[in-house]
């Protein structure tokens, strides 16, 4: 089961009072519901691919409105042949939609009814219902952090974005081919959203994976940095050794000034160590890294003169 499915299963087990239940159900029906006419009777159908979400819709409708609800199961025929669950009620359809702020004076509204988000708990419940209806979140182990809520209606998606940002989540709004999404890209904001809607187990798992992942990335960056520094040190040492070998072949190390001769011999004998370590091995006393670098640069310059056939003065 995916991280998003586990999270939705957790959300459907949250106990809420009637006002918060209405807020959650309002989002679920607005986003996944449809009104049809059958035998001169209005029917509400609420569709989802998540079995636990279907049970949540079923229980909320029965609890709030005390009407008969049936759950139908259909097999999706395209692409992934998942089950589709349809919660259907034929009783008080228009009254239910009116009470949930979806139908006003016989007209469907696409924005969020202010009566459904009157206080903090109702806002959280509405966002929870919206996530159950059209939400998805990447597994935190994947390459990018992403949480989104899809809505068919742009007005509603913009309302969700605004509602999310009332909690400083830095949500963004984006139009898609068949609707719009409100989405989050920052790991910390996704964590805040999970906490906001009551997904505490999902939050713990998300944070555990994120901490391990961030630690792994930090270690990788450190290793890469150290590897780059090591490669740089080795490359510089190889060039220095080549220069020293050329000097030895052409004029002999014994003809170098004492301060250069000892450094040249130390570098050839200890090619793998850093300049700081090399400087500590000088017989006349430790030499700083910059001092060693200066002497080795002198040896490189001397080798370059030999390569270019220039006159050499020791």
Swiss-Prot record:
Listed GO MF terms: DNA binding
Q: Tell me if DNA-binding is a UniProt keyword of this record.
A: yes
UniProt keyword annotations, A-Z: Cell cycle, Cell division, DNA-binding
InterPro entries of this UniProt entry?
Answer: Homing_endonucl, Sporu_reg_WhiA_N_dom, Sporulation_regulator_WhiA, Sporulation_regulator_WhiA_C, WhiA_LAGLIDADG_dom
What's a single GO BP term from this record? cell division
UniProt DNA-binding residue ranges: 274-308
Q: Which family does it belong to?
A: Belongs to the WhiA family.
| DNA-binding recorded as keyword | yes
Report which superkingdom the organism of origin falls in.
Answer: Bacteria
Which species is the source of this protein?
A: Staphylococcus epidermidis (strain ATCC 35984 / DSM 28319 / BCRC 17069 / CCUG 31568 / BM 3577 / RP62A)
Coiled-coil features, chain-numbered ranges:
none
Entry function: Involved in cell division and chromosome segregation.
**Entry protein name:** Probable cell division protein WhiA
Q: What is the lineage of its organism?
A: Bacteria, Bacillati, Bacillota, Bacilli, Bacillales
């Amino acid at each position: 089961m995916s991280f998003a499915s586990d999270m939705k299963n957790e959300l459907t087990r949250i106990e809420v009072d009637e006002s918060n239940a209405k807020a959650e159900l309002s989002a679920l029906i607005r986003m996944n519901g449809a009104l049809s006419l059958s035998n001169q009777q209005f029917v509400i159908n609420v569709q989802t691919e998540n079995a636990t979400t279907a049970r949540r819709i079923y229980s909320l409708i029965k609890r709030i409105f005390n009407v008969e609800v049936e759950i139908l199961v259909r097999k999706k025929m395209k692409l992934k042949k998942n089950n589709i669950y349809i919660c259907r009620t034929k009783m008080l359809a228009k009254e239910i939609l009116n009470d949930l702020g979806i139908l006003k004076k016989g007209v469907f509204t696409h924005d969020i009814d202010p009566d459904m988000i009157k206080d903090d708990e109702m806002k959280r419940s509405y966002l929870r219902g919206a996530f159950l209806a059209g939400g998805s979140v990447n597994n935190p182990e994947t390459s990018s952090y992403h949480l989104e809520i899809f809505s068919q209606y742009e007005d509603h998606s913009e309302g969700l974005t605004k509602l999310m940002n009332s909690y400083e989540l830095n949500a963004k709004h984006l139009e898609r081919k068949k609707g719009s999404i409100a989405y989050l890209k920052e790991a910390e904001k996704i964590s805040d959203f999970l906490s906001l809607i009551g997904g505490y187990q999902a939050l713990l798992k998300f944070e555990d994976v994120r901490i391990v992942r961030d630690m792994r990335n930090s270690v990788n960056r450190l290793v890469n940095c150290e590897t780059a520094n090591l490669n740089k040190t080795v490359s510089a040492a190889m060039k220095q050794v080549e220069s020293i070998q050329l000097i030895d072949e052409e004029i002999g190390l014994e003809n170098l000034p004492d301060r250069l001769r000892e450094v040249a011999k130390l570098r050839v004998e200890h090619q793998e160590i850093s300049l700081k370590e090399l400087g500590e091995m000088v017989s006349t006393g430790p030499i700083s890294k910059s001092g060693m670098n200066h002497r080795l640069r002198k040896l490189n310059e001397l080798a370059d003169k030999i390569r270019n056939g220039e006159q050499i003065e020791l």
